């Protein structure tokens, strides 16, 4: 605490990122990184861009990157907004589109950055409980009285991994024509349906994605939003009031290559999905309750073993998983899908723990 802080700073409860330890030989299944490295074409593109032009500022509009994203997603380039990771994109969303003096609505169990942004920008919010089986129910987002200041949810949801169908998402969008509905699709490429094709049909729909997960670029920090031009223009106005150059030259080159290498993208995400199903079956065989997942992680609990203790005992065996000390989910572990060998090591460690 400092007497020099602005009043809002003391009220903030900042986001707590997943652990990024520097210890060697850890099996890291705690932050939903892709177990496969980026496309070789990404590394080639970054190497080619690492030249004398680094003395120059990058393109503030990121036109080439926006074009590559637009081509991959199936929209026009002026329907794309890019940022320094999807977290920055989301931060601009809250500032540009949600500050109406009315509560923003999002699930009670969801991405924990949402209430952080609300606190930072002094936006009121209302959490909407998931169902007893941890689903988002579109009926819970029907408007009642005054329109919400905004609606945002991940699809698939995080940390649960459960996904809505495209029709279910569209029900929420259609029911709230006077409210911007933001669908955070960080994990969509691992088995869910993107609603990006619907942005031409609904001017209140914004879709946010990241290259951190399915494109294996968590270390490069590139995210984007897709929506109608008026929403994108609002985001651009906030960006250019904050940082006109969020995407550096190396990140732009690597991200373009990642978006263009569809074959590598398909091959690695299919591998993750196949491993997820095997790991889920192995966990169930050990007695875990495992929620259906359309993400690159699973959410699981064991009826006879405390989740926090399990996480600690796995760490003793150099395996990291994510534990959330939060009501309703404090007996769950979120486990990132690793390589087959990493997931086999996890199952082996659990068997040893259970045999003690």
Swiss-Prot record:
Its EC number is 2.6.1.9. It holds the Pfam family Aminotran_1_2. Keywords: Amino-acid biosynthesis, Aminotransferase, Histidine biosynthesis, Pyridoxal phosphate, Transferase. The modification N6-(pyridoxal phosphate)lysine is found at residue 213. The keyword Transferase applies. NCBIfam families: hisC. This is Histidinol-phosphate aminotransferase 1. The lineage of its organism: Bacteria, Pseudomonadati, Pseudomonadota, Betaproteobacteria, Burkholderiales.
């Amino acid at each position: 605490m400092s007497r020099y802080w602005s009043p809002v700073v003391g009220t903030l409860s900042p986001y707590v990122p997943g652990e990024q330890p520097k210890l060697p030989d850890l099996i890291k299944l705690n932050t939903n990184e892709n177990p496969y490295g980026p496309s070789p074409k990404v590394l080639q593109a970054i190497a080619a861009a690492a030249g004398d032009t680094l003395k120059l500022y990058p393109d503030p509009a990121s036109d080439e990157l926006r074009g590559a994203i637009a081509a991959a997603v199936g929209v026009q380039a002026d329907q794309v907004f890019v940022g320094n990771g999807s977290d920055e994109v989301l931060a601009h969303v809250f500032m540009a589109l949600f500050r109406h003096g009315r509560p923003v609505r999002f699930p009670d169990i969801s991405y924990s950055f949402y209430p952080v942004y609300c606190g930072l920008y002094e936006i009121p919010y209302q959490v909407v409980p998931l169902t007893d089986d941890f689903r988002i129910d579109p009926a819970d987002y029907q408007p009642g009285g005054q329109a919400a200041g905004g609606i945002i949810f991940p699809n698939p949801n995080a940390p649960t991994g459960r996904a809505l169908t495209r029709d279910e998402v569209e029900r929420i969008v259609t029911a709230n024509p006077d409210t911007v509905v933001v669908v955070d699709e960080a994990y969509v490429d691992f088995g869910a349906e993107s609603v990006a094709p619907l942005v031409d049909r609904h001017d209140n729909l914004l879709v946010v994605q990241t290259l951190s997960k399915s494109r294996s670029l968590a270390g490069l920090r590139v995210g984007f939003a897709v929506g109608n031009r008026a929403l994108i223009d609002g985001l651009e106005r906030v960006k250019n009031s904050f940082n006109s150059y969020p995407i550096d030259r190396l990140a732009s080159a690597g991200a373009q290559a990642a978006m263009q290498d569809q074959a590598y993208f398909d091959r690695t995400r299919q591998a993750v999905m196949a491993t997820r199903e095997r790991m889920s079956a192995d966990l169930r065989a050990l007695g875990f309750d495992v929620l259906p997942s359309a993400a690159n992680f699973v959410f699981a609990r064991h009826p006879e073993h405390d989740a926090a203790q399990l996480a600690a005992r796995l760490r003793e065996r150099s395996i990291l998983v994510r534990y959330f000390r939060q009501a309703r989910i404090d007996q769950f572990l979120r486990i990132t899908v690793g390589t087959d060998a990493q997931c086999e090591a996890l199952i082996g460690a659990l068997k040893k723990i259970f045999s003690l």
